């Protein structure tokens, strides 16, 4: 059994970048970094860092199914979201964690979105929602550089905080 498993799902590469940062910060050699969509058997670990990309305010069914199957583990969540961090997201995802696990905390940073999202925003524009669409497009444009170096550093600080809570 591994000490640490960094398991992630990444549609655009954003969450994969944060996963690699988290993995590099974990001590020792008893660790692995795996895409949840792998065909390989996912090994057991004492501590799971589980990453996801946010779609419609939560994680995918693959991630929620994996979370709900864990028992007696220490779990930290991380993710990327085009709209940025929101405690609501972490709450919705952590709800899949069974009570016999130790939920350590979460880290979410902004991630770039596909160009089709910007095009969808533009197609939704009306006189009534013009200001709201402007804010969505402004956020989209700000997200283009994320996750950036500062996000990566914040992910490492997150790991440092989680390591203080972890019992191996």
Residue ranges of model-derived segments:
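N-terminal beta1-alpha1 ligand-phosphate binding loop
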Residues: 2-25
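FMN-binding flavodoxin-like domain, especially the glycine-rich phosphate-binding loop
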Residues: 25-30, 47-168
């Amino acid at each position: 059994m591994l000490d640490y498993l960094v398991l992630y799902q990444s549609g655009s590469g954003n969450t994969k970048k944060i996963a690699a940062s988290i993995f590099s910060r974990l001590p020792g050699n008893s660790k692995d970094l795996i895409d949840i969509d792998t065909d390989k058997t996912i090994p057991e670990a004492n501590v799971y860092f589980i990453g996801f990309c946010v779609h419609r305010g939560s994680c995918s069914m693959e991630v929620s199914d994996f979370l709900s199957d864990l028992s007696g583990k220490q779990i930290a969540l991380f993710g990327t979201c085009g709209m940025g961090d929101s405690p609501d997201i972490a709450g919705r995802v952590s709800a899949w964690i069974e009570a016999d696990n130790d939920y350590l905390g979460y880290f979410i940073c902004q991630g770039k979105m596909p160009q089709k999202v910007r095009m969808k925003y533009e197609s939704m524009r009306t006189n009534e929602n013009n200001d709201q669409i402007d804010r969505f497009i402004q956020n989209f444009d700000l997200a283009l550089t994320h996750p950036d170096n500062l996000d990566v550093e914040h992910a490492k600080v997150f790991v440092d905080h989680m390591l203080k809570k972890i019992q191996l």
